[in-house]
From Swiss-Prot:
ATP binds at G11, R72, Y73, G102, D103, G104, S105. It catalyses: beta-D-fructose 6-phosphate + ATP = beta-D-fructose 1,6-bisphosphate + ADP + H(+). It comes from the Bacteria. It comes from Listeria monocytogenes serotype 4a (strain HCC23). Its cofactor is Mg(2+). Homotetramer. GO terms for biological process: canonical glycolysis; fructose 1,6-bisphosphate metabolic process; fructose 6-phosphate metabolic process. Allosterically activated by ADP and other diphosphonucleosides, and allosterically inhibited by phosphoenolpyruvate. Substrate binds at T125, I126, D127, R162, M169, G170, R171, E222, R243, H249, V250, Q251, R252. This is ATP-dependent 6-phosphofructokinase.
Length: 319
C-alpha cells in the first residue's frame, strides 16, 4: 500500500479535523502518500481529490467542523455512484480509504468494501448512535455545549421561577438528551428510546412544587417531538407555561474537547495501521478505553441502544 485517501461525510462533528490530522500524519510517518477528498462521497465521484502534506493539517487539532468539507450524496447508494467512486480511486492510484462519519457514511464504506476496495470507518457524529463504540467523535463536545446552555438557562429559570424546555439533537438516539440532562440535573428527560406519559411528567413537576421547587428544566430530544409541541402539550395537562430553547446546529460547532481530540487521534492512527495490515472493511471504536475494530457490516446490523441504567439513574436523581 502506497497511497491512501480520507473523506468526511454527513453531518459535521467536532473532532473530525483532529481525526483527519491523525490519519495524515500517521500515514506520512509510515511512508504513505495521503490524499484528501473534498465534500465526502460527492467529491469522490467528482474527483475532487488533493494531495495532503504534513503542513496541510497544521493548526487543525482545535478547529471544529471539517476542513475537507462535507455533503450528503444519497446517489452513492446506487451501483453507478459506487463504480464512479472506485474509478476515481483507481485513477488517482489510491490503495485504501478512511471514511469519517455516521451511519450513512458507514453504508458508503461498506459498499466500497463489498466491491473489493479496502475501507476503514471512523465514527464521527454528535449523536453517539453508532454501535461498536462507547463514544463517537464529537459527542463529548456537543454534550458540553448543551450542558453549558443548560446551566445558563437554569440561572434564568431560577430567577423567574419558570419551567424551561430545551430541545436538543437526536432524531433516533437520545444520548445527548440523556447525558446532558443527567449532568445538568434536568427534572425530566425525554428520549426516542423510552416512551413517556405527560401525566407522569406533570406529576413529577407537581411533586417538585410541593417541596418548594419553583423552577424546572426538561430536556427533549428532537426525535420525540419539537420543544414547542412538548410545551403545548404540557400546558394542556397542567399550569406549566414553559419557555422553549431550541439549541439546533450550535451543538455541531465549536472547538473539540480534550476527550474528542484524543479519541479522534487514537482512532485516526489505528485506521492507518489497519490499512497497512491489509484489513479493510472494519470500523474502529473505543470500548472501556481500548481501541477496538469490528466488521463494518456487523456494526450496521446492530442497533445502538440507550444506556438503561444511566436513564434510570437520571430519573432517580432528578426527584
Amino acid at each position: 500500500m502506497k497511497r491512501i485517501a480520507i473523506l468526511t461525510s454527513g453531518g459535521d462533528a467536532p473532532g473530525m479535523n483532529a481525526a483527519t490530522r491523525a490519519v495524515v500524519r500517521k500515514a506520512i510517518y509510515e511512508g504513505l502518500e495521503v490524499y484528501g477528498i473534498n465534500y465526502g462521497f460527492l467529491g469522490l465521484v467528482n474527483g475532487d481529490i488533493r494531495k495532503l502534506e504534513l503542513g496541510s493539517v497544521g493548526d487543525l487539532l482545535h478547529r471544529g467542523g471539517t476542513f475537507l468539507y462535507s455533503a450528503r450524496y444519497p446517489e452513492f447508494a446506487t451501483e453507478e455512484g459506487q463504480l464512479k467512486g472506485i474509478e476515481q480511486l483507481k485513477k488517482h492510484q489510491i490503495d485504501g480509504l478512511v471514511v469519517i462519519g455516521g451511519d450513512g457514511s458507514y453504508h458508503g464504506a461498506e459498499a466500497l468494501t463489498k466491491r473489493g476496495f479496502p475501507t476503514i470507518g471512523i465514527p464521527g457524529t454528535i449523536d453517539n448512535d453508532i454501535s461498536g463504540t462507547d463514544f463517537t467523535i464529537g459527542f463529548d463536545t456537543a454534550l458540553n455545549t448543551v450542558l453549558d446552555a443548560l446551566d445558563k438557562i437554569r440561572d434564568t429559570a431560577t430567577s423567574h421561577e419558570r419551567t424551561f424546555i430545551i430541545e436538543v439533537m437526536g432524531r433516533d438516539a437520545g444520548d445527548i438528551a440523556l447525558w446532558s440532562g443527567l449532568a445538568g440535573g434536568a427534572e425530566a428527560i425525554i428520549v426516542p428510546e423510552e416512551s413517556f406519559n405527560m401525566d407522569d411528567v406533570v406529576d413529577r413537576l407537581n411533586k417538585g412544587r410541593e417541596r418548594g421547587k419553583k423552577h424546572s428544566i426538561i430536556v427533549v430530544a428532537e426525535g420525540v417531538m419539537s420543544g414547542n409541541e412538548f410545551a403545548k402539550q404540557l400546558a394542556e395537562y397542567g399550569d406549566y407555561h414553559a419557555r422553549v430553547t431550541v439549541l439546533g446546529h450550535v451543538q455541531r460547532g465549536g472547538s473539540p474537547t480534550a476527550f474528542d481530540r484524543v479519541l479522534a487521534s487514537r482512532l485516526g492512527a489505528r485506521s492507518v495501521e489497519l490499512l497497512l495490515e491489509k484489513r479493510g472493511g472494519l470500523a474502529v471504536g473505543i470500548r472501556e478505553n481500548r481501541i477496538v475494530e469490528n466488521d463494518i457490516s456487523e456494526i450496521l446490523k446492530e442497533k445502538h441502544t440507550l444506556d438503561q441504567k444511566l436513564f434510570d439513574l437520571a430519573s432517580i436523581l432528578s426527584i
